[in-house]
Regions:
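Short glycine/threonine-rich loop-to-helix capping motif typified by GTGT followed
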Residues: 360-365, 498-501, 541-545
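Conserved beta-strand termini and adjacent loop/short-helix elements that scaffold enzyme active sites
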Residues: 133-135, 185, 286-288, 382, ...
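Active-site proximal loops enriched in glycine and acidic residues that flank catalytic Cys/His/Asp
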Residues: 307-310, 353-355, 383-385, 405-407, ...
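Cleft-lining beta-strand/loop regions that shape enzyme active-site pockets
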Residues: 49-168, 297-424
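Intrinsic disorder and flexible/low-complexity segments
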Residues: 300-303, 307-343, 462, 533-591
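Flexible, low-complexity junctional segments that flank or bridge functional domains
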Residues: 3-48, 59-61, 97, 122-129, ...
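Charged, glycine-interspersed solvent-exposed loop segments at helix/strand-loop junctions
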Residues: 172-270, 422-502, 506-507, 512-518, ...
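C-terminal long alpha-helix characteristic of the crotonase
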Residues: 227-228, 259-302, 415, 471-477, ...
Length: 591
């Protein structure tokens, strides 16, 4: 009877919670539908576009309204696509007189910031002004802000200027303590993704290539800031060594990093003066979202821009309503590319790629889908912050490849890792195993028993075949010999500017140049762009999600395991991922 009452009580509580959640979601759904029917945004004279150099930036703004609602960032995830479009519209809109950039901590990759900066430099060609102000500027935010005519800081504000560094954690010893061993398999001396689990420090090849690309990023930042602010690169490096965030704001004026110190109310007066307004007048502000709602002309033929970013997987894993992760799921992308191929209204396709790779199997399927698309219409790749390993695999099938100078690309190689916890189970936990089998390798693949030399040979042979196939795809797509490909492969990571020299990409430039090239290949004189895939509707997001219980369990694990949480999650992810991977060892952001 007691158990029965418990079950009844649990059911009642569950129904109550479900009704509350359903009500909240229903209200949000109605709000979303009402918002989607809002009138087209219009502008009035003396308007200002406001850009916030703060928060997370993805290729596209977040369409998950529930995740945005619970996000620490009040504006949700910012989209590079929407930001660039807003700057471009502001350049030609006669009512918009300038751009006001609000400083903060911008979490964007190097190529995204470079594209933003290029768009702002182009905006200034219109003769319009840009003003930047903030209580604090992260290093990346300051890099973008130096396009401004004037940069102001709060009297007690800070600029974080310290150079670029990256750390890699190595888990070999802690895994050994709990009886877990990672057996690595790879092709390519630069393919270092297995090192955190099998080594105690970075290998020399890994260190060399990492130093090259973070050094290239830093040089790009310093050269741009030097040109904008009239400060030598050597002086900027001296400032970085001083850790400017610890210095008083007055020093930053002396160093010519900023133009003055103002309080929040005073910066408004500066903007009003630029607009010719009286002190009591209001500033007409437009956000990126406002600009997105402005009507655009769609003359000519369509060039589709298809966005792919995140880990490459076979299919999208279930996420709870509060998660907002992105994946390149081969099942979905292949279907989408086939639809674009069959749409006669679309004359060319630009695939925007920002990924460090993932499943080798999924990468091969994506390569095939791009090949089929290319047979019907021109395909141009626009690389973002990264288009490496599996992401380069799919890219090499295109007609033409654009990369930013700071794009991370290449990493032509394959690796695999086998998770073996036999020592944990038998020696640490005291679990005994016995087995019955019909053949010598019937239990092959079990993580609870040690692998034989023969079994390890099977896996390495599979890795070798995948590597040869990967290289053959690159050779075919880039019109190189297998010998040439081997010279630049080995898992070596390149900056976009270096990849151009070895023919892994065709040209340096951003998304706009990629679209123009696609139109030229299709022999289209006038065009407009369409963005794909179309975002999921509210109900589709809801039906494809899980409950929020995953977040609660994850939080409890974090509290219970403490410092052991990260290695636990890493080993769990190893068990869940495809056995053969084509991905970058790690990703760095310029904060």
């Amino acid at each position: 009877m007691k158990d029965f009452l418990k079950n009844v009580g649990a059911t009642v509580v569950g129904l109550f919670l479900f009704s509350v959640i359903a009500t909240v979601i229903g209200i949000m759904g109605i709000i979303g539908m009402v918002a989607s029917t809002e009138a087209t945004q219009t502008t009035s004279d003396n308007s200002v576009l406001v850009l916030k150099l703060d928060g997370i930036m993805e290729e596209q703004s977040s369409q998950n309204e529930i995740a945005n609602w619970f996000s620490d960032n009040e504006d949700g995830v910012q989209g590079l696509q929407e930001t660039l479009a807003a700057i471009k519209k502001a350049k030609t809109n006669k009512d918009i007189k300038g751009i006001y950039m609000e400083g903060g901590s911008l979490a964007a990759d190097m190529a995204q910031m470079q594209e933003m900066r290029d768009a702002l430099v182009d905006f200034k060609k219109s003769g319009k002004w840009i003003i930047a102000y903030g209580e604090a500027f992260s290093q990346g935010a300051y890099y973008v802000a130096t396009t401004a005519d004037k940069i102001y800081l709060n009297h007690v504000g800070v600029i974080d200027w310290h150079g670029i560094g990256g750390q890699v954690a190595f888990y070999k010893d802690i895994l050994a303590k709990v009886g877990v061993k990672i057996i690595p398999f790879k092709c390519g001396k630069y393919k270092s993704a297995t090192e955190p689990f099998t080594e105690e420090k970075m290998s020399e090849p890994s260190r060399q290539q990492t130093e090259r690309y973070i050094g290239g990023w830093w040089n790009t930042i310093c050269q741009a800031v030097s040109q904008s602010r009239g400060i030598s690169v050597s002086t900027l490096n001296t400032y970085a060594d001083q850790v400017l965030s610890m210095e008083p704001a007055e020093n930053l004026v002396k160093y010519k990093l900023i133009d003055g110190l103002l309080y929040n109310d005073e910066i408004k007066d500066v903007i009003k003066k630029r607009l010719g307004l009286d002190k009591d007048d209001d500033i007409k502000q437009l956000s990126v979202a406002d600009m997105e709602n402005m009507k655009e002309e769609t003359n000519g033929d369509e060039v589709a821009v298809y966005y792919t970013y995140g880990d490459i997987v076979d299919r999208v894993p279930k996420q709870n309503l509060l998660q907002n992760n992105h994946f390149i799921a081969s099942e979905d992308v292949c279907d989408d590319l086939e639809s674009l191929a069959n749409d006669d209204n679309i004359k060319a396709v630009v695939i925007r790629v920002n990924s460090g790779g993932g499943s080798a199997y999924a990468s091969e399927q994506l390569w095939h889908a791009v090949q089929k698309l290319k047979a019907k219409k021109p395909v141009v790749i626009s690389m973002g912050g990264a288009a490496a390993s599996g992401a380069y695999y799919l890219s090499c099938a295109a007609n033409y490849i654009f990369a930013e100078p700071t794009t991370i690309t290449g990493s032509i190689g394959i690796f695999g890792m086998v998770f073996n916890k036999s020592e944990l189970m038998t020696q640490k936990l005291g679990i005994k195993y016995d087995e019955v089998k019909t053949n010598r390798n019937s239990t092959f693949g079990s993580a609870d028993t040690p692998m034989t030399t023969e079994q390890m040979g099977f896996i390495q042979a599979s890795i070798n075949r995948g590597y040869i196939l990967f290289k053959s795809r690159v050779a075919e797509g880039r019109k190189l010999s297998m010998e040439n490909v081997e010279e630049v492969a080995q898992g070596h990571v390149y900056l976009g500017e270096d990849a151009l020299k070895i023919k892994l990409v065709d040209e340096l430039g951003g998304l706009d140049r990629a679209v123009a090239k696609a139109a030229a290949l299709a022999k289209v004189k006038t065009w407009y762009t369409g963005s794909y895939p179309e975002p999921q509707g509210f109900m589709e997001q809801l039906l494809n999600s899980e409950t929020v219980k995953g977040n609660f369990l994850d939080e409890q694990l974090h509290l219970t395991l403490g410092v052991l949480y990260e290695p636990f999650m890493l080993t769990r992810s190893l068990q869940q991922m495809d056995p053969i991977q084509a991905r970058l060892p790690f990703r760095l952001q310029v904060n």
